[in-house]
Amino acid sequence: MKPDYKNWVPKSMVYGLAGGTVIAFLAFMLLGATGAVFHGTPRLIAVIVFGIGTLILLFFTGWMAALHRTFDYNGKRKLSKTIIEGTAKYVTIPDGGTGLDVGCGSGALTIDAAKRNPKATMVGCDIWSGAYKAVFTKKRCEDNAKAEGVTNVRFTEGNAVHLPFADASFDAVTSNYVYHNISGHDKQKLLLETLRVLKKGGTFAIHDLMSPARCGDMDAFVKRLKAEGYEEVRLIDTADGLFMNKKESALLGLAGSMLLIGKK
């Protein structure tokens, strides 16, 4: 049995866009190009609308297909694996301690961090709902841990907006590309909610899209944490050679990827 961490860009998304492209093209041909239905101005409007629609859908289909190949755990680039392993190496937990992975998805980061801390326990939490609920599930997490032979993990339901854990519950906290997907909430407040459950002296490694447009002034956020007594706080640009280069990050829509690491 092999682990199946799935893809951050599911095939169903690619197939859906491809299907939409075909439908738009057929509508373009039937309603516009052939003149079989419309004539004159209505035909011209149909040509423009469905022609542009076809091109837009074709672009996004190609882009999503490229993303799928890039993120594929079994593909050539394996960017997801690179990011997971690169983030997990910053997760350090004392023997007997417990770490938390917020928004664990299919369990990849939780399991990798557990492997690196065999005498500690990792907890993965997620709401496992929305657009990815058919792909990322609690059972998939548990199956992946079993396939990897990792026993020092457990998975539970938990929302990143209001984590179901008391203050200072964990010796380490981590997360990967979660907060930018949560609409309607201040991203710095989401980060603080995760850090709330971290013990004094605990470590954190949080990877996400942290551009000013998404997260505000992160340099000021770092200064705030230091002023509150955090022992160490650093921001690492992972789109500038660590996980990917600037050109690749721009093409993938991952510009602004940052790793927030430190010790409380």
Language model features: what each stretch is:
Residues 228-229, 242-264:
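Core SAM-dependent methyltransferase catalytic element
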Residues 95-105, 123:
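Conserved class I S-adenosyl-L-methionine
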Residues 117, 182-184, 198-200:
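Helix-to-beta-strand junctions that scaffold the AdoMet/dcAdoMet cofactor pocket
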Residues 188-200:
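A short glycine-rich, Lys/Arg-flanked "PGG" loop and its adjoining helix->strand segment in the class I
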